[in-house]
């Protein structure tokens, strides 16, 4: 969020007070990131890079945690190709901790196969569709823009990819949209924290997938960035309630 100190402090609290403590307590050593690691697809400054390294990437190394990450649309410089992307350019010093998924592939997590699909663009669209037809994994993870799902609370996506391509899978886990929602086998996990005002009041989670039972557990992030204050302006003013 434009390297705002307010947002960076908020995100640091999430990682230090919520996310990493939960992983350490439950001995979780593997993260699967479904895309959109960075915010601005065109540029990022040194302040944001330094902050991200200290509060997240260095912690992966310190705690012995690895992360598989799929390209999201915010990670790619161009809209018609994924070739130039922030993940390759900026995470080269963490290759032991970070595995960047550039092409559709099947990963094996403790015996559970998960098909991972990067952001679908004109250049890789046919490759991704062919993969979805032949993939033998029961679960798909991908940053998807599917018609009929909420992008943010109360704002449905009126265009986008048809969900029929995913009908044969047991479970589809996707990011991209900020709102958490589910329809049949497709689960939008939503953002794990608040980024915009339309996130206000919409509970945020990260999720834990049990590779044995295939059960998914949402873990609530209690930290918020935005709050709405309601008051009777015939009796109070904003100044009085803020004091």
Name each model-derived stretch.
Residues 1, 39-42, 68-81, 107, ...:
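Active-site environment of divalent metal-dependent phosphoester hydrolases
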Residues 1-54, 127-137:
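N-terminal active-site segment of His-dependent metallophosphoesterases
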Residues 28, 62-67, 167-170:
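A short helix->loop->beta-strand "cap" motif at the edges of active sites that frequently abuts
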Residues 31, 36, 52, 72, ...:
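Divalent metal-coordination and catalytic microenvironments
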Residues 46-61, 84-95, 188-204:
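Short, electropositive alpha-helical surface patch
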Residues 75-164, 192:
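Conserved catalytic scaffold of divalent metal-dependent phosphoesterases
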Residues 152-217:
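Conserved beta-sheet core of the metallophosphoesterase superfamily
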Residues 210-243:
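Accessory, non-catalytic peripheral segments of nucleic-acid enzymes
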């Amino acid at each position: 969020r434009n390297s705002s100190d307010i947002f960076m402090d908020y995100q640091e609290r999430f990682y230090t007070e919520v996310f990493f403590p939960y992983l350490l307590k439950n001995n979780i050593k593997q993260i699967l990131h479904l895309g959109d690691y960075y915010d601005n697809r065109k540029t990022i400054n040194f302040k944001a890079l330094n902050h991200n390294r200290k509060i997240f990437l260095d912690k992966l190394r310190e705690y012995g945690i690895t992360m598989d990450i799929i390209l999201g649309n915010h990670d790619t410089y161009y809209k018609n190709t994924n070739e130039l992307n922030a993940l390759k350019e900026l995470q080269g010093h963490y290759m032991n901790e970070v595995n960047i998924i550039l092409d559709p592939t099947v990963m094996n997590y403790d015996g559970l196969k998960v098909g991972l699909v990067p952001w679908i663009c004109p250049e890789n669209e046919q490759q991704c569709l062919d993969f979805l037809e032949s993939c033998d994994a029961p679960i798909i993870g991908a940053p998807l823009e599917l018609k009929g799902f909420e992008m943010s609370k109360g704002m449905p996506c009126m265009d986008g990819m048809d969900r029929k391509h995913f009908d044969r899978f047991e479970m589809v886990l996707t990011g991209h949209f900020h709102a958490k929602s589910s329809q049949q086998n497709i689960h939008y996990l939503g953002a794990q924290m608040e980024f915009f005002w339309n996130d206000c009041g919409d509970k945020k989670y990260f999720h834990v997938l049990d590779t044995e039972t295939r059960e998914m557990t949402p873990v609530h992030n209690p930290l918020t960035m935005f709050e709405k204050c309601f008051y009777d302006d015939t009796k109070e003013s904003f100044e009085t309630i803020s004091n």
